[in-house]
Amino acid sequence: DSNGTGGPAGTLDKPLVMRSDNYHVEIAAMGIPATDKTYQVFQCTWWASVRRAQIGKPVDGYMGNGGDWNDSARRFGYPVSDSPQAGDVICFEPGVHGSDPSYGHVAVVETVNADGSILISQSGRGWMSVVTETITAQSLAAMGGGISFIH
């Protein structure tokens, strides 16, 4: 039953609440409203903004398109690096890892695993949903300068 609730996911203090398919995030069960003042609901930027606010690491309401977030973060004084930490926003430059070739993509790092892989949560990849993805350390390394992490 894809509408059932699965277990928690991630290592943040406020873990994701998963549907029974362990792919879709149950945002209503997490108390996250499907509204926002500045980002279009269910776009990647909306999810990164509301998830960061939920974990106590809010971002500015005007960071731009996903691929712009790392540059905006630097302008706003947020630390940006090439090393992931749980709670970071991962910023994909346009066209990297299947992101939109014009707009790029952002997601939230939920877990950094001992093997260097990361679990991310993201929106803007499907119809009106938030989903998870594990990216291997090898894939992250292959993306090189096409990704960055906003702490």
Task: Identify what each model region corresponds to.
Residues N3-A114, L119-S123:
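Secreted/periplasmic proteins that engage bacterial cell-wall peptidoglycan
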